[in-house]
Amino acid sequence: MEKNINTVKATPLGGKVWFNAIFFGLIGQIAWIVENMYFATFAQDVFANSGRSDMSYWVTTLMVILSAVAATATTIFAGAWSDRAGKRKPFIAFGYIFWGITIMLFALLPMKVSSGSVFMVAVLIILFDCIMTFAGSTSNDAAFNAWVADNTDDTNRGKLNGILSILPVIAVVIVFVGLGGLYNSANESNALFFVVIGLIPLVSGIIALFLIKDAKGLSAGTAGSRDTLGDTFYGFRRETIRSNKMMYVTLIAACLIGTAQQTFYSYLINFLIITLGLGDGFVIPMAVIILGSAVVTGIFGFMYDKYGRRRFYFPVLLMTVIGILSFYCIQYTEGTARSLLLYVGGIVMMGGLLSLLAALNANFQDSIPSGSEGRVQGVRMCFTVLIPMIIGPIISLILGLDAMGINGSDFVPPFSLYAAAAIVASIAVIPVAVIRRRAAR
């Protein structure tokens, strides 16, 4: 249950915790941005260049779904393993090193293939993506998220989660503005881009060996327990659900918001480039939207701890829905009105999404049973990654293929993606209302 933060002095986190959380959190988000956006864009470009635009939707959908399955399964086992070991550091450090190596695998793939090689390349793209996800989920989803929960409490999670929720958009700026010039869909190969990106988590993993420290008092919470399978699936037990109902209500809300985001997220770059016709000029509006939403999210993060999260749930959810709908409405505007809706609507959309997810993540961490920070990361992944990354892309696939029937063989992400996303996000009002009512008690 959320406490009245006004009457509780926030526990200081310390400079080392802040630095490690932000630095390794950012590195993880840079790697995830490459997977969530560039791997999808890469696959879409490869098949568009090869004259198989229809494969763009199918491969993107399979990539997202199978990587979500890999991420969830990995986190379930790795989270429980880190709890039993009583350590997070080796999972983070060695996981980041392996993560970097797996990103470099994409350097082996060309940007255009012959008709006889299309299927093989599709399989390799999906396989490499799943291998990369295994590394990332072990180090980031399981170990790093458990490390954050270990080092925070309900008086300072709002600030830290607010900052952490900004990191994905900062990572987008770093990748697209700082490194995006290395990637070009017209290149024969984008090997240099994937090698450079892969070096970032690889080197960071080596640094983690010297900087990351496990929380004081962290011990092998289930050492001596022989029920390995039971510990692994702790978050899925009936008794765990009954004893921690609000944790699961929070996850349902996060699941709906995540599904809304996944409905359009993998196609966002090509939506700006192709659908809106911005071409290479998409970088400027994306940078403005990212920076603007980062400011919005940061402000909400500090306000959560100062005033309590309860009063912000509904306003931030409304922001999210309105922002998503604004992108759908862009098709009905021109000139200055179109640009204004793109920039303002984008900031409201991404700012709302990130701020709401930050609040829900903090509420989830508040609800974790003591000593089970690693074991519940798997069930968190099930609700925030697996389900959203199955349902969202399927919605995209249906709408995308339907649009191709209208536009011919061209690959043009449709505006209808945002209408569907807004509908899904609106349903989150039900679990959010329950969370808000419980927080008032």
Where are these regions (language model features)?
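C-terminal ends and interior cores of transmembrane alpha-helices
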Residues: Y96-V118, M319-G335
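A membrane-interface helix-boundary motif in multi-pass transporters
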Residues: R88, G181-L199, L397-V424
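Cytoplasmic membrane-interface "Motif A"-like loop-to-helix N-cap segments
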Residues: R84-I97, K306-L318
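Helix-to-loop junctions at the C-terminal end of transmembrane segments
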Residues: A73-G86, V296-R309
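C-terminal transmembrane helical hairpin of 12-TM major facilitator-type secondary transporters
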Residues: R311-L357
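Juxtamembrane intracellular "pre-TM" segments in multi-pass secondary transporters
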Residues: E2-G14, K216-L251
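Glycine-rich segments within core transmembrane alpha-helices of 12-TM secondary carriers
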Residues: T72, G158-G180, M381-P393
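Helix-loop boundary and gating motifs at the non-cytosolic
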Residues: K3-A68, M246-A253, I257-L276
